[in-house]
């Protein structure tokens, strides 16, 4: 079956829903697709709740994690939307998900107000550099008291300001996803209002299309008769069908291959651009030669490293971080782009220990090489829990 070509006429923006479990992230995601389908039927399919809810699953450490990808269009933009899972104790995919966002819709139930995961997700959005948030104050059909809604809105704004988002300026839109999903006209209108706020407030990202091509590997699979497909979000540059690429990181040797196909949302493209989630079909590459944590890049433009210096922030106990200090030779995991790599920390001379809540410089030696440049962000994690965030300031080896 011939695949439809993807029309690249509108600006493309990656967004997602974040927030506390059961505050209505998935219901809102479904409601957005329904309301936009009703308003612009030619542009939008409706994606039902069940389809988003039973997102493709990955099992890790006995917990099932899923991320659903849906696409929709407003009059001015094309959106790719990820619905993030809501486990407070398990943010691995939230990190890969949040790292893929040009902006996010923070869903807060008016019936509950901000909860622990609300705070955690806002913190995480700041760490992984989500540039802008819009708030959907959900379940407003269930709160009769106007003052109560105003109080919750105030709490949310204070929380955003605390994590260095412009809490006073961020749009807070009152919605009710469930009635909107069931065709209620008034609440359907509220979802359109939300999407107007997203259109206006979340900036069209400056894509890094001018830079040399690089894409972190998220997943690898084999398509019978066609070869190996590598999926991920293109971090920078453009990749065209027929170009040579290099696959590097994690292992000692790098390998070269040729891109024989690029696809996005099951549609074939001539090229993939920075910011897009694509699958690359690679000639002659075996599935076992590629793993999550590697990158696919323009040959000769990036190199894997194990040793670097970094500036980091260590989460306080209240933010869900460590309860105790750490010392020289601390060995956590360093989460770069899509994967964790263990590393050994050397503290600066004169620093005996680092307390939760501190900022510090540190030198790190990783046990596996990661493709990196100065400025690359990472999370510091222990057993799947984020305990710090940092940026590479200098590559030493």
UniProtKB/Swiss-Prot annotation:
The keyword Hydrolase applies. Mg(2+) binds at residue 26. Residues 62-66 are annotated as: G2. Residues 138-141 are annotated as: G4. InterPro entries: EF-Tu_GTP-bd (IPR041709), EF-Tu_GTPase (IPR050055), EFTu-like_2 (IPR004161), EFTU_2 (IPR033720), G_TR_CS (IPR031157), P-loop_NTPase (IPR027417), Small_GTP-bd (IPR005225), T_Tr_GTP-bd_dom (IPR000795). SUPFAM superfamilies: EF-Tu/eEF-1alpha/eIF2-gamma C-terminal domain, P-loop containing nucleoside triphosphate hydrolases, Translation proteins. It comes from the Bacteria. PROSITE patterns: G_TR_1, G_TR_2. It is found in: Cytoplasm. Keywords: Cytoplasm, Elongation factor, GTP-binding, Hydrolase, Magnesium, Metal-binding, Nucleotide-binding, Protein biosynthesis. Its main location: cytoplasm. One of its GO terms (cellular component) is cytosol. GTP hydrolase that promotes the GTP-dependent binding of aminoacyl-tRNA to the A-site of ribosomes during protein biosynthesis. This is Elongation factor Tu. The gene is tuf.
């Amino acid at each position: 079956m011939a695949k439809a070509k993807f029309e690249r006429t509108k600006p493309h923006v990656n967004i997602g829903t974040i927030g506390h479990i059961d505050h209505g992230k998935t219901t809102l995601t479904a409601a957005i697709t329904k309301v936009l389908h009703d308003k612009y039927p030619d542009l939008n399919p409706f994606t039902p709740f069940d389809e988003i809810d039973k997102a493709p699953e990955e099992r890790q450490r006995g917990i099932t994690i899923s991320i659903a990808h849906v696409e929709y269009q407003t009059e001015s933009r094309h959106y790719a939307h990820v619905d993030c899972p809501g486990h407070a104790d398990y943010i691995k995919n939230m990190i890969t998900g949040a790292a893929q966002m040009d902006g996010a819709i923070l869903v807060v139930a008016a019936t509950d107000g901000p909860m622990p995961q609300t705070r955690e997700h806002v913190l995480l959005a700041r760490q992984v550099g989500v540039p802008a948030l819009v708030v959907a104050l959900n379940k407003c059909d269930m709160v009769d008291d106007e003052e109560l809604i105003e109080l919750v809105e105030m709490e949310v704004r204070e929380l955003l300001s605390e994590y260095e988002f412009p809490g006073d300026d961020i749009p807070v839109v009152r919605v009710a996803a469930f009635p909107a999903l069931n065709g209620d006209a008034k609440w359907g209108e509220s979802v359109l209002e939300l999407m107007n706020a997203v259109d206006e407030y979340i900036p069209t990202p400056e894509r890094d299309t001018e830079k040399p091509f690089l894409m972190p590997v998220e997943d690898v699979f084999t398509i019978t008769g066609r070869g190996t497909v590598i999926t991920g979000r293109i971090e920078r540059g453009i990749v065209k069908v027929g170009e040579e690429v290099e696959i590097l990181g994690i292992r000692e040797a790098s390998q070269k291959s040729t891109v024989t196909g690029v696809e996005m949302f099951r549609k074939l493209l001539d090229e993939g651009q920075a910011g897009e989630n694509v699958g690359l079909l690679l000639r002659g590459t075996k599935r076992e030669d590629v793993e999550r944590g590697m990158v696919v890049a323009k040959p000769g433009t990036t190199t894997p490293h194990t040793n670097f210096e970094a500036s980091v922030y260590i989460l306080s106990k209240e933010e869900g971080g460590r309860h105790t200090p750490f010392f020289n030779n601390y060995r956590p995991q360093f989460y770069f782009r899509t994967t964790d790599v263990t590393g050994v920390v050397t503290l600066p001379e004169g620093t005996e220990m680092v307390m939760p809540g501190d900022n510090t410089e540190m030198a790190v030696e990783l046990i596996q090489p990661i493709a990196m440049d100065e400025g690359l962000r990472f999370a510091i994690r222990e057993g799947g829990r984020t305990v710090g965030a940092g940026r590479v300031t200098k590559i030493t080896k």
